[in-house]
Structure formats: C-alpha cells, structure tokens
Curated annotation (Swiss-Prot):
NCBIfam families: pdxH, PRK05679.1. Catalyzes the oxidation of either pyridoxine 5'-phosphate (PNP) or pyridoxamine 5'-phosphate (PMP) into pyridoxal 5'-phosphate (PLP). The keyword Oxidoreductase applies. Keywords: Flavoprotein, FMN, Oxidoreductase, Pyridoxine biosynthesis. Its EC number is 1.4.3.5. GO terms for biological process: pyridoxine biosynthetic process. FMN binds at residues 62-67, 77-78, 83-84, 106, 141-142, 186, 196. Its cofactor is FMN. The lineage of its organism: Bacteria, Pseudomonadati, Pseudomonadota, Gammaproteobacteria, Alteromonadales. This is Pyridoxine/pyridoxamine 5'-phosphate oxidase. It comes from Shewanella sediminis (strain HAW-EB3).
Length: 213
C-alpha cells in the first residue's frame, strides 16, 4: 500500500496579487467561475460544499450545486425537511467551499442563509426537467429508507400521478440565499507559498487582507 504522505505536487498555474484584485469580491468570483466553466478539466464547476452545524455544534458537510449568484449572495435549492434545512433553521450561519483543484484554486465563503420566497423557488422549479421535479416529491431527504427499490417504486408511482400536466411545487421544497460576510480566494503557489486573500464585509464595503499560507 502506498503511503499517503508521499502524495504531493507543485502548484504552478499562477499567482494572485493584491494590486490586481477588484474592490468587490463578487467580481473576482464571477471571473473565476467563468474560467472554471470554460475549462475542460472541471466536470462540476458549480459544485460546492455546504457546511452547517446542528444544535450540539456538530458540523456537517455535503455537496450542493450553486444555481445563481450576484452581489446579494449565493443561491441553492434543497428539500426543506432535509438535515441541512433543519440545521439552518437552528443556526443560519453557514460556510461554502468551491474546490477547483484542477485550477489550483478554492473559494471559501462564510455567511448567513436566508430562505427564498415561494415565487423565487417556483421560478427555478419550473425550469427543472420533469423527472427532477418528480424526484423532488419522491425523496424525503436524509430520512432512512429500507432499500433503493422503495425509492424507485415511489418514483414510478409519482411519475404516473403527474403524467399529465405540470408537476406542482412541493411545499417542502425550497431554496436559500447565502449572504456573504467573508470570501477567501486561494491560489496555489510554488513551494507551498500559496496566495490567500480574504474579503471581509464592512459597513462601507469590503476590507481586503492577505493571509499567510
């Protein structure tokens, strides 16, 4: 068995310099996201880790797809009865991480998650493929199930039920916007001298600090 301690590589794709940074982190995130989408080395550039904590302070993470972002925040959709939603109801402070390994980059975001309005959720829900809309009705996310067959049987049942017409929006399905309080950009550097810049939200705008790697 190979030793994990022997696995290493150099980071050589480029650096990040403070004089090149925009005053608004969303501008830099938009640029990096566009580059991630245009690259041919990332299959899921919008995939992000969403970290929440439960009532006991136990953290949990899961991969969720980013569906929209702007100066107001970062949007994702989910089952409102899921573990993540239950934890957000207890503590709305969350963390997001975009691990763009192939580009030697990552973006870490902290902020508060706020529920989206039903109108905002519906606007997105109707754009989903019909099978995905049906799947939203099928899965009681994070609950225990006896076997995959139970899930597939329920899907077949709901597919028949909604075979004619539009699939209605489940009351237990919605979304959140994470309003950022900090955004950190990490760019890999040679000899582990990585570039890290932290944008911290202030009343007058954003403070930018370089962090030691």
């Amino acid at each position: 068995m190979s030793k994990l301690s022997d696995i290493r590589r150099e980071y050589t794709l480029g650096g990040l310099h403070k004089e090149d940074l925009p005053g608004d982190p969303i501008e830099l995130f938009s640029k990096w996201m566009e580059q991630a989408r245009d690259s041919e080395v990332l299959s899921d550039p919008t995939a992000m880790s969403v970290a929440t904590v439960d009532a006991d302070g136990q953290p949990f993470q899961r991969i969720v797809l980013l569906k929209r972002f702007d100066k107001g925040g970062f949007v994702f959709f989910t089952n409102l009865e899921s573990r993540k939603s239950q934890q957000i109801a207890i503590n709305s402070k969350v963390s997001l991480l975009f691990p763009w390994h192939s580009l030697e980059r990552q973006v870490a975001i902290t902020g508060e998650a706020e529920p989206l309005s039903t109108a905002e959720v519906m606007k997105y829900f109707i754009t989903r493929p019909k099978e995905s809309q049906i799947a939203a009705w099928v899965s009681k996310q994070s609950s225990k199930i006896s076997a995959r067959q139970a899930l597939e049987s329920k899907f077949a049942e709901m597919k028949a039920k909604f075979s004619q017409g539009e699939v209605p929006l489940p009351k237990f399905w919605g979304g959140y916007i994470v309003k950022p309080t900090s955004i950190e950009f990490w760019q890999g550097g040679e000899h582990r001298l990585h570039d890290r810049f932290l944008y911290s939200k202030e009343n007058s705008g954003w403070d930018i600090s370089r962090l030691a790697p």
